[in-house]
């Protein structure tokens, strides 16, 4: 089946701009830390709520060429970039394997979308852009065989973790969410090890969050990891990791001395 591409980046940007809200813009700029020296310094907002952006994505999904998506994620506007990245999520969803269908063409498309995302990963330059997209793009890609039958190289997570870019480092950690949900913890624990000593709070939170997700699937795995690593963790990482434990158990971890 041939896809007819009906929407351009300009069409989508116009639809988003028609909903811009100055009051909401100011609130978002504060929330996403766009001030001088903050992690979101210089980012620009139209003032859209996430459901508004998703509404546009639902309207145009499957009918936007990757070349137009590339223009969206190059935009200076946060919501336009988000829209572009969410369109990649939708494209990945369309080619996920099912019990009845998993063609070489679908596998090739998954690889194309993942590679596209990796080339533009630094444009996912705030935590929401990372968290809403990387598990459903890179995470899904890493779960399934490529067209030649081999599995994608999960060493990409290590390379992202070793990047000098904060957002690529967060991608390295948060991508594991999809793997964790499928009972695969090894990569998450390995990347957590790489990032435990990271200086930034956004990485402390990401590592703790993924450890918490491991615990939701298998508490014994989380507890074993904490026994070995809690003394090396930032306090924020530990608090996030143990958040879903019972209160007595949580307090016991918090009272431990390194």
Please name every model-derived segment:
Residues 1-258:
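Alpha-helical scaffold domains
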């Amino acid at each position: 089946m041939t896809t007819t591409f009906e929407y351009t980046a300009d069409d989508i940007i116009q639809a988003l701009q028609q909903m811009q809200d100055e009051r909401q813009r100011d609130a978002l700029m504060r929330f996403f830390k766009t001030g001088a020296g903050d992690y979101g310094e210089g980012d620009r907002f139209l003032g859209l709520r996430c459901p508004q952006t998703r509404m546009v994505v639902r309207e145009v999904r499957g009918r936007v060429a990757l070349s137009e998506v590339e223009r969206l994620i190059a935009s200076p506007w946060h919501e336009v970039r988000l829209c572009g990245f969410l369109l990649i999520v939708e494209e990945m969803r369309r080619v996920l394997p099912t019990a009845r269908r998993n063609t070489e063409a679908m596998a090739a498309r998954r690889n194309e979308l993942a590679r596209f995302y990796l080339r533009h990963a630094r444009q996912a330059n705030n935590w929401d852009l990372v968290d809403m997209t990387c598990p459903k793009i890179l995470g899904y890609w890493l779960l399934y065989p490529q067209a030649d039958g081999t599995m994608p190289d999960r060493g990409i997570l290590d390379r992202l973790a070793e990047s000098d870019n904060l957002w690529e480092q967060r991608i390295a950690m948060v991508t594991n969410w999809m793997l964790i949900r499928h009972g695969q913890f090894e990569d998450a624990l390995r990347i957590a090890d790489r990032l435990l000593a990271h200086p930034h709070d956004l990485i402390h939170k990401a590592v703790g969050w993924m450890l918490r997700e491991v615990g939701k699937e298998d508490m014994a795995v989380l507890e074993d990891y904490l026994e070995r690593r809690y003394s090396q963790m930032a306090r924020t990482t530990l608090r996030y990791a143990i958040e879903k434990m019972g209160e007595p158990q949580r307090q016991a971890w918090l009272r431990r001395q390194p």
